UniProtKB/Swiss-Prot annotation:
Pfam families: DUF697. The gene is ycjF. It comes from the Bacteria. This is UPF0283 membrane protein YcjF. It is a multi-pass membrane protein. One of its GO terms (cellular component) is plasma membrane. Keywords: Cell inner membrane, Cell membrane, Membrane, Transmembrane, Transmembrane helix.
Length: 353
């Protein structure tokens, strides 16, 4: 038997035709135009943080100027002249048996040698600080690389610089997790998740401790000058501690350079984050109304110390931040507020007893 016919279906609107793609006319570029050709930008609105970091890199990139080369050449020529004159004086004093002049030449040679040694030491420490930025760039390249052979040696070098012993549990877990079939990206990624957090946790504890000390000191101290000196001293100590944790030995000039890098990084890249994480929370909770003026100033000083520590941590780390593992200012803010409230409650309850 044949199946019955289905009833007719009437549509209210006619069928829509599929849209046809419209192609633009062919355009041919000349050789002169192809040299100045630039592709159109797909995303014209980059993130503020990326723009700020690019501005920081451009501002901190060393610039070789003619005046600097002339000054360095003059200093080198002056140093060579001093050494040559010292050798001539020593030879004349030896020939004439002028022992007093010979002793003066020996003392001058010791002073010059000590000065040269200190300059070489400072230069080596400054070079080590600059080398950390190159290591961070190399790690960023390895994290996007699919090659094999460089990742393990690079991570072992980082562990040696940080003073992590071969018998450390975190390093042993990393050795157990890697194998020959993994590429550099996977090996460096495992190091970033298994070994690097050990140093990051120590740096976070140092930042929390120094920020809490700054907050409490400002909150209870009545002298503004003492507060300023204390905060400056503690911030420098914090930067030194973080640099030591990550295996960087700071000298005088390298310490100044790192402090300058931290301040410039805050000035360029920290304003938006500081307003976003601090200002809105303060307005919502109205902390200024519930805490005293000194307590509010103490929280501000503690947040500044924490911000310095976070940026010093970022500049001293040999690896870039991965998977949003960068410490946030809000975490330290909540901790500082809790510690300050606890201290104020204890101070109020002690006179009642």
């Amino acid at each position: 038997m044949s199946e019955p016919l289905k009833p007719r279906i009437d549509f209210a609107e006619p069928l829509k035709e599929e849209p046809t793609s419209v192609f633009k006319a062919q355009q041919t570029f000349s050789e002169a135009e192809s040299r100045t050709f630039a592709p159109a930008a797909i995303d014209e609105r980059p993130e503020d943080e990326g723009v700020a970091e690019a501005a920081v890199d451009a501002a901190l990139r060393p610039k070789r100027s003619l005046w600097r080369k002339m000054v360095m050449g003059g200093l080198a020529l002056f140093g060579a002249s001093v050494v040559g004159q010292g050798v001539q004086w020593t030879m004349n004093a030896w020939q004439t048996q002028d022992w007093v002049a010979l002793g003066g030449c020996a003392a001058g040679a010791l002073i010059v040698g000590a000065g040269v040694g200190s300059v070489v030491t400072e230069w080596r420490r400054l070079w080590r600080l600059r080398q950390r930025a190159h290591e961070r760039d190399e790690a960023r390249e390895l994290l996007h690389s699919h090659s094999v052979g460089k990742g393990r040696a690079f991570c072992e070098k980082l562990a040696q610089q940080a003073g992590i012993d071969q018998s450390h549990p975190a390093l042993q877990r990393w050795y157990a997790a890697i194998h020959e079939t993994q590429n550099d990206r996977e090996i460096v990624g495992l190091y970033a998740h298994l070994v690097q957090p050990v140093l990051d946790a120590q740096a976070r504890r140092e930042i929390s401790r120094f920020a809490a000390e700054s907050t409490l000191m400002i909150a209870v101290s009545p002298l503004a000058l003492v507060d300023m000196a204390f905060i400056a001293w503690r911030n420098l100590r914090l930067i030194n501690r973080i640099a030591t944790l990550y295996g960087i030995e700071l000298g005088y000039y390298s310490r100044l350079r790192l402090f300058r890098l931290v301040l410039l990084n805050i000035a360029f890249a920290g304003a938006s984050e500081l307003v976003r994480e601090v200002g809105m929370d303060w307005m919502s909770q109205d902390l200024a109304a519930r805490l005293s003026t000194r307590a509010a100033q103490g929280i501000g000083a503690g947040l500044l110390t924490a911000r310095l520590g976070i940026k010093a941590m970022e500049l001293c780390r040999p690896l870039p931040w991965i998977d949003n593992d960068k410490p946030r200012l809000g975490d330290f803010r909540r901790q500082l507020i809790g510690q300050l409230k606890e201290t104020l409650q204890k101070s109020k309850s002690s006179p009642e007893k």
